[in-house]
């Protein structure tokens, strides 16, 4: 169970970093 929690936290932090970088730059992919 601990491994599942650690993987969830890792994916969560990576997701937050990805979205912060994505929203910081202009959304060129959407347009």
Curated annotation (Swiss-Prot):
The chain crosses the membrane at residues 3-23. The keyword Cell wall biogenesis/degradation does not apply. Disulfide bonds: none annotated. The keyword Transmembrane helix applies. It is found in: Plastid, Chloroplast thylakoid membrane. One of its GO terms (cellular component) is photosystem II reaction center. Belongs to the PsbT family. This is Photosystem II reaction center protein T. It comes from Tupiella akineta (Green alga).
């Amino acid at each position: 169970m601990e491994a599942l929690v650690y993987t969830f936290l890792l994916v969560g932090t990576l997701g937050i970093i990805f979205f912060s970088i994505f929203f910081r730059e202009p959304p060129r992919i959407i347009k």
